[in-house]
């Protein structure tokens, strides 16, 4: 389990890259398959390509930054993780919504791009996604969403 430091994948990553990681920075030069960042708990993940379906599923904290596209059900059932995607998102998961990019988010994206040696992409090109916070506590009115 990744707790700190930097892991740099010099190509593509298979399923569940960065699963349950608590800290540090994971850089993937290529694409990441399904469930990238599943249940992440504080790690920052930068994918220079695209991510597959169910990425950031039940992600609790940290950041997932995707320079390409994202597959189905991005951010399904996530908590406080912030997701940034430059390309297209096929679909958002349950309780995941697009959110406003404020100056502090532009700064965060800029820092991650710099740490990952990405200088041809501007932070303003990304969209931000996060939890709508409807599923934090059980509510009978939302039972069909669980």
Regions found by a protein language model. Give the residues of each.
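Tandem repeat protein-protein interaction scaffolds
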Residues: 3-10, 22-25, 41
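Intrinsically disordered, low-complexity terminal regions
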Residues: 8-10, 15, 29, 35, ...
């Amino acid at each position: 389990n990744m707790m700190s430091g930097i892991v740099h994948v010099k190509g593509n990553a298979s399923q569940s890259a960065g699963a349950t990681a608590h800290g540090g920075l994971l850089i993937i030069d290529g694409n990441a398959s399904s469930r990238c960042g599943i249940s992440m708990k504080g790690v920052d993940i930068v994918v220079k390509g695209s991510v597959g379906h169910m990425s950031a599923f039940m992600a609790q904290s940290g950041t997932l930054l995707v320079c390409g596209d994202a597959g189905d059900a991005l951010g399904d059932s996530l908590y406080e993780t912030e997701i940034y995607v430059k390309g297209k998102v096929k679909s958002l998961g349950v309780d995941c919504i697009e959110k406003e990019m404020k100056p502090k988010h532009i700064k965060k994206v800029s820092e991650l791009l710099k740490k990952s040696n990405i200088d041809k992409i501007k932070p303003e090109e990304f969209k931000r996604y996060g939890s709508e916070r409807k599923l934090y506590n059980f509510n009978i009115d939302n039972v069909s969403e669980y």
